[in-house]
Amino acid sequence: PEFGVPTGNFGDAFAGWAGRKIGGNIGHIHAAVNRNDALAQAINTGHYVRHQATETASVSMDVQAPSNFERLVFEASGRHAEGTKGVFDNFNATGNVHLSGDLQNALRAQVTASTISEDETAQTIKYAHDKWNKVICPHTAVAVAAALKRNDGQPIIALSTAHAAKFPEFVTKALGFAPDVPEAIWK
């Protein structure tokens, strides 16, 4: 199956890629990011620019320079250490680097990415409740929204990374009511 992965530092997505590399039954990896979308821009356009991170409801994903992205670039470059070092030395010095067309194509062959807005995140929390009677957190909603956007007919699993009770204000606003919180969450 394919996987939609909520992505901040790109660790879970890279772990999925590595699992596939060693023979795991892992299909395509689709990185789902919030409006802090430097990773998605790098994969989709080849232009990797560090911006100031902005706070979102999916706060663990508020990252503009994902630490694990360098690992994927290294692998996509054919494990070319000097080339990868050059890309990230340039990025670290300037906050801006343009990836070559070959590298960009190699990256997209490994991972695709979508940017999900705060409105889409809220709408997806409501959709998950209305359609499946599930209350999901903002991080999970970003992954579900990206999976729904992918819509290529292949089964896709959206990773869920937190409990919705950790985000009561945003989830309540999205649903229009305060969901029940399991007793175990309060302990």
Please give the residue ranges for each predicted region:
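PLP-dependent amino-acid enzyme catalytic core
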Residues: 1-187
